[in-house]
Amino acid sequence: MSAKLKQLEDILRPVVEGLGYEFWGIEFRSHGHHSKLRVFIDDAENGIAIDDCEKVSRQVSGVMDVEDPIQTEYTLEVSSPGMDRPLFRLEQYEAFIGHKVQIKLRMAFEGRRKFLGLIKGVEGDDVVVVVDDHEYLLPFDSIEKANIVPVFE
């Protein structure tokens, strides 16, 4: 996690959790002079509705205006993680053992950067993924992006 993402998480996690939601994670993407800050919230019992996103957005916006951690123009987006939820922390991988996942690494590992397989588990700081009957131990710090892949049966 970059220093900027850590700073944003430290500011926003208490706001989201103070409103009674789970802070799932954040993404910050810079696009030239304009950026996008995505805040993912969850509620395992009740799910997330548009009203929940609006409520969190208002609070986050107010805190961001006061703290001012982003010096450029940006758009704030608050949403549920959805069915293809991104994974940000090792605990989230543990919670989705047996689920299909798409992982993109920062650098190639064993000749590839993209892995599509099943989460087998977490061993220390490694995510164990099975791809075509081959088991990979992917260092968590090397993962650039990971999303659950919904399976419709």
From Swiss-Prot:
Top-level taxon of the source organism: Bacteria
Q: Where in the cell is it found?
A: Cytoplasm
For the keyword Cell membrane, the answer is no
Name the UniProt key words of this record, in alphabetical order.
Cytoplasm, Ribosome biogenesis
Query: What main location does UniProt list?
Result: cytoplasm
The record's section on SUPFAM superfamilies has: YhbC-like, C-terminal domain, YhbC-like, N-terminal domain
Q: Which family does it belong to?
A: Belongs to the RimP family.
The protein's role, per its UniProt record: Required for maturation of 30S ribosomal subunits.
HAMAP family recorded for this chain?
Answer: RimP
Protein's UniProt name: Ribosome maturation factor RimP
The record lists the organism as Marinobacter nauticus (strain ATCC 700491 / DSM 11845 / VT8) (Marinobacter aquaeolei)
